[in-house]
Curated annotation (Swiss-Prot):
Protein's cellular compartments: Mitochondrion; Membrane
Any matching Pfam family: SNase
Family: Belongs to the LCL3 family.
SMART domains, A to Z: SNc
Residue ranges of the TM segments: 15-32
PROSITE patterns to which the protein is assigned, alphabetical: TNASE_3
Identification of the protein by name: Probable endonuclease LCL3
Annotated ranges, domain TNase-like: 53-261
Keyword Calcium (UniProt): yes
Species this chain originates from: Saccharomyces cerevisiae (strain Lalvin EC1118 / Prise de mousse) (Baker's yeast)
Signal peptide: none
Keywords in alphabetical order: Calcium, Endonuclease, Hydrolase, Membrane, Metal-binding, Mitochondrion, Nuclease, Transmembrane, Transmembrane helix
GO terms for MF: endonuclease activity; metal ion binding
Amino acid sequence: MREGDSNSKKSADVAVLSIILTGSTLTLIYTYKRYLTQFKRTNDIPRRIFRKHWLYGKVTSVGDGDNFHFFHMPGGIRGGWGWLRPVPQMIKNGSTAEKLVGDSRNMRFFNFNWITHGRSTKSKIQKAKSQFLKLNVPYKNRKNLPTIPIRLCGIDAPERAHFGNPAQPFGNEALIWLQNRILGKKVWVKPLSIDQYNRCVARVSYWDWFGGWKDLSLEMLKDGLAVVYEGKVNTEFDDREDKYRYYEFLARSRKKGLWIQNKFETPGEYKKRI
């Protein structure tokens, strides 16, 4: 083979190799940006994700009965989380929820009516509360992390004490239940919209070893710790409104959780009143 032909072949090989390397690099960049980029705040989530895709991550903080903070971990272990990319470590609580919000359990009912029915109702309410207050909250909330605030779709949990306003009955119990169920655990989140507080309204799914995949909003309704969302703005059900209303009806008919009360003010009514 002549020297000129040999040089031409080498040049062609180099060109092909360069094209392959360039193509591979561009593919890797595209794959990373599309599938492995971490969303660190609500506004980072692309519009193409809403209503169509699920995000995987860890719950690092639960501050209320129907919302929490979500640390996005795209790709999971295959995306490098836990061996190439650090995952926030939770701090063990070392305390039960009963100690953390003992004020809820020890709440005094100032009722001077000694009629047996009244005393029986009060006892039933305390008993209903106690089953939630005894739940273990294994971790403390982690703050100051790049997380997305998530608002559970389709439901409203009883309000806790805010800005000097009193808490609703079962407000603390709903918080404890949610902390027990998801704090420090991995969940899947399906973004649906963004509300007026810049929270991502989403359907949330988590794995239960005894029952498989669970819809978090639905589980709260089943246990009587939330009602179907009543608002007219940012109303999101992800095509599950009928199912949510059915299980709310079951919880109400069985007097589970907050439905044990004879007189009940919904979270929506409470917010309008104050």
